[in-house]
């Protein structure tokens, strides 16, 4: 960089790291790598992971995102991951496999943090910032998961590296713009980041001392033009691709119109949050002016100021205006904040040095950073023990799905938890969809879609289902192992006369009645039950036989596949169901999920 070292640079000499410090860094990095590998294997599946996997899998089946599969995320991540998902195939360990794909992205984010620290401050700051981000609990958890935010983070950090990592050149402007465009094609939250970066650059230019107050010379305008032109390249290619696939309108509907809901989330519950933004600016502007005034001819100092302002303004915009805030929204800003925290250590040592009037060993800075990393790693394992397998539920669900269901059979789920099966309805039940249902902006079509598609399976009960949907599923599906099957648990249904239990059938189908793990012996609709029976839509009643307690009405096809709600083993023949299930058929291309 063009200027002399910043205060405290004697504590962070670029090539002055001792062997002991390098060994300590290596030990921290190794511990973080082991923790991350254990998280890949054991971390509880987040509902976003199978949703992203389902969309990527859809591309491998010849389905078009948005047109055939609903998704309210930008498409680049799913398009990039689709070949890997297709190569792996349908396996119960799909989540773990997908997380391994995130490991290189985490490595790239770490490398970008290092290079940003090295170019803006020093090699030591870059090294310890890269080490410390792997010890932030929320960062480790979210960046381990298979989600578009990982690619989003990498694109954003390398965009900053190209634009702020040194004196901006024509090549850097083109590269930075291309990366910004790819980031925008990965997540529409990049709009906040681009706005933050633009405001940060404008404030940095405006707050420079008067002797450097040539606002934007001709070269600066040319560089800005290159950045803007390059930023448009990847989004333009995405638009062209989806236009050719006759899915451009669906893309706009799913990613823009669907997500714009008046009064959504914090917009309704905290309407004065927008005040966070002007309050943040009232603090940032004088602090930046004072920082830039300390040295009147320092390009590196201006780049640092722009970096700090970008991080702060992004957080202010997010907290002030974004309606639904999640942990992953902070993923790209976490390395920036950690980098700033590490950079404050040599600055603090320089202050202490001036106060004491004598030199302070840079080892104190190393000790502070290493201690923070160790405490952070402990926090990672306190938040969720990396050695304890919390991912069994999703694996068991996928095992049951692949074992008991056929590729062309739809399954009711929230957001795509079954990954390799379609939903009976188009929309997924994520936060915005549920808000639209609650506001009456969307009609609840699930019961009609279940009947229309003759859906026989659903995922287990989950409090994330909207109340009406949850009640419908509990009334018409029975939990058997890791899946729910079309039917009714008569122990929770209203009685229809003395000892009779009523249940509802939503479309014509053959049902078996199982009592305490064996064929029932009571009467169904007034006729003695002797085997599977074809039932028409509407209400029916069953009167238990002598001694029958736990009674379930179950779709007969599930019984033939071995899905029986009892510990007592029971053959298909004993229940009177067909000998074998039909062979699996490939999913129909173009069907809606």
Located regions from the model:
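Transmembrane-helix motifs of polytopic, lipid-linked glycan transferases
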Residues: 26, 30, 100-120, 135, ...
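Loop-to-helix entry region of an early transmembrane alpha helix in multi-pass inner-membrane enzymes
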Residues: 75, 79, 89-108, 142, ...
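Membrane-interface transmembrane helices that cradle and orient dolichyl/undecaprenyl
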Residues: 124, 157-175, 207-209, 286-301, ...
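Membrane-interface alpha helices of multi-pass inner-membrane proteins
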Residues: 129, 142, 162, 172-188, ...
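Specific aromatic-rich, kink-prone transmembrane helix
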Residues: 132, 151-168, 175-180, 198-206, ...
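Hydrophobic/aromatic-rich transmembrane helices and adjacent perimembrane loops
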Residues: 142, 149, 192-193, 316, ...
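Extracytoplasmic
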Residues: 189-190, 245, 374-500, 518-539
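Transmembrane-lumen/periplasm boundary regions of multi-pass, lipid-linked membrane glycan transferases
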Residues: 209, 219-300, 313-328
